Structures are given as C-alpha cells and as structure tokens.
C-alpha cells in the first residue's frame, strides 16, 4: 500500500493513508478477489512500525478487524533509550534512528506527548491486538524494543511469535538474502503466514 512519506508528510499522514486503504480493502476486497476474512498487515523497519501503529488504530477505532500483523524488525520506540538503540551497530546507528524519528514525528519529536499511534511502544494496553509475528537480529538497533514489545504482547494475551536471529543486523534479510540466517527468517515468515492464511 502506498502512503505519504515523512519528512514531507509527518505523522499522522502515512498512518491515516494506511487506515483508509485498509478500510477500503476490508469493505471492497471481494470485488478484487481478496478474502476479506483473512487480511493481515506488516512491513519491515519503519513499515513494521507503521503496521504496529495501524493495528493499534484499527483496534481503537473498532470499525473492522485485521487477522494478523507481521512486524519485521519494526521501528516502534521513539524514546531511543534501550541499550541496542544506542549501539553503533551496522546499518542503523543512533544518528539514523534520530533522523528517522525526527522526520516521522516532526514537531512532536522528543516530546512527552507522542501519541501511541505514532510510537506503538508507548501503548500500555496491548490487549485485543491480532496474532503477531515479530523478528529482529541481535545486532539490530531495534532488537531490545522489539523483544520488549513481543513480551508485552504475550503478557496481554496476544498470540505472539518472536524470532531473534543471532549476529543479524537491521535489514539482514534484504542485503544478505542468500545467508543461512536470512533463509531461516524467510522460512519462519512463510510458516507464520501459512498458519494465518
């Protein structure tokens, strides 16, 4: 799904675009051959964060439901206070994280008033979310926030799969697609999707 991108269009533009597109699909999907009873959302990195935020927004607005979320090393914690968020790790260093969040949040960056639909890790109530798949590598700046989010989902009663890949940095499944760890990640994703669909 296409949505307006930051920094030209900061929060909530992209999220509202995604919600509108998903709502259209739920209401009209059968006209284009989509089984509207089995729709999930997902994405990698900022797209994974957008998917997590979209799942919260869908739950909170209550107009329709989604069946699962697939969060691939999602960017979900704007506070950037975890240990891994401050490591100088390959691919996504602290400066990259600062740039990503400041671009997305605009004037809300480093504010105490960042909405949970902008930064899902801020949400205290994770009940009522759909079954969730989360993956991250141990060398990913988002590893700590993703692991913590998965644990919180699990404690909230959300069926949650967490996959952590040793030695894998952010985006490993793309730039190192032929490695054993990337093949394992694809296998884990496919198995989850097989169970959801």
What are these regions (language model features)?
Residues 1-197:
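Alpha/beta-hydrolase superfamily serine-hydrolase fold, recognizing
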């Amino acid at each position: 799904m296409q949505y307006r991108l930051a920094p030209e269009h900061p929060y909530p533009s992209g999220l509202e675009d995604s919600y509108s597109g998903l709502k259209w699909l739920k209401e009209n999907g059968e006209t284009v051959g989509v089984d509207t009873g089995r729709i999930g959302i997902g994405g990698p990195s900022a797209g994974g964060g957008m998917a997590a935020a979209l799942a919260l927004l869908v739950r909170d607005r209550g107009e329709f439901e989604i069946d699962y979320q697939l969060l691939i090393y999602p960017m979900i914690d704007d506070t950037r206070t975890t240990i891994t968020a401050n490591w100088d790790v390959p691919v996504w260093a602290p400066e990259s994280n600062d740039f990503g969040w400041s671009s997305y949040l605009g004037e809300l960056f480093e504010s105490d008033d960042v909405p949970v639909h902008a930064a899902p890790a801020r949400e205290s109530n994770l009940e009522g979310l759909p079954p969730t798949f989360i993956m991250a590598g141990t060398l990913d700046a988002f590893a700590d926030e993703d692991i913590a989010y998965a644990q919180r989902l699990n404690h909230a009663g959300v069926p949650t799969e967490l996959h952590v890949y040793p030695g894998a940095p952010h985006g490993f499944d793309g730039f190192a697609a032929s490695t054993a760890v990337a093949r394992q990640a694809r296998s884990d994703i496919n198995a989850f999707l097989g169970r959801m669909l």
